[in-house]
Amino acid sequence: MSDPAIEVAPVPVASPAKAKKEKKPKSDKPKKPKAPRTHPPVSDMIVNAIKTLKERGGSSVQAIKKFLVAQYKVDTDKLSPFIKKYLKSAVEKGQLLQTKGKGASGSFKLPAAAKKEKVVKKVTKKVTEKKPKKAVSKPKTGEKKVKKTIAKKPKVASATKIKKPVAKTTKKPAAAKPTKKVAAKPKAAPKPKAAPKPKVAKPKKAAAPKAKKPAAEKKPKAAKKPSAKKA
């Protein structure tokens, strides 16, 4: 018996991967340059406002906003969230002291240490734009000066070479005469002053002793003759 024909199921052919959708090239539109800031950062403006107002009990938020409008001509309604945010963080960090109220409302004052700091100066764009121009012009002037000096140097060298054959009498430096050191004569020792002569006491003239007359010598008595013994 013949085997029945085995039907082979067709193998599904792998369909080619769908081509990825090509990304549309972004239109290179020139980005609008951000409008330059016409005022310094909010933190600097608030610090400057509190310093200039110099209120003993601290400056209120309304007073600070009025100062910002008058000094920097800014829209305080747009800056109010930034003002509140800075006031809260400054109080937490110890950069500001809150004398009244809580949170971002109330009055604020600078601590004693912050008052000594200098007020930040405004930096306008005109000053920053002029600086690079000056920096570019400086090297140009420097190059011209270098070229002029290099061109002049060989001329000076040639002039000196021509003058070399002329023998110049160079004056010999006069020999320094040895200075004889005259020995300083020793000063004569001062003569010793004569010792004062001791005063000799003149002996008083002794009174001449009167010569005593010698006493008359007594004549010796004649020895008695022995009497003749009687027989």
Curated annotation (Swiss-Prot):
Residues 1-44, 124-231 are annotated as: Disordered. SMART domains: H15 (SM00526). Gene3D superfamilies: Winged helix-like DNA-binding domain superfamily/Winged helix DNA-binding domain. One of its GO terms (biological process) is chromosome condensation. PROSITE patterns: H15. Pfam families: Linker_histone. Residues 1-17 have a biased composition (Low complexity). Disulfide bonds: none annotated. GO terms for molecular function: double-stranded DNA binding; nucleosomal DNA binding; structural constituent of chromatin. Keywords: Chromosome, DNA-binding, Nucleus. Its main location: nucleus. One of its GO terms (cellular component) is nucleus. Residues 38-112 form the H15 domain. Histones H1 are necessary for the condensation of nucleosome chains into higher-order structures. Belongs to the histone H1/H5 family. This is Histone H1. It comes from Chironomus thummi thummi (Midge). The lineage of its organism: Eukaryota, Metazoa, Ecdysozoa, Arthropoda, Hexapoda.
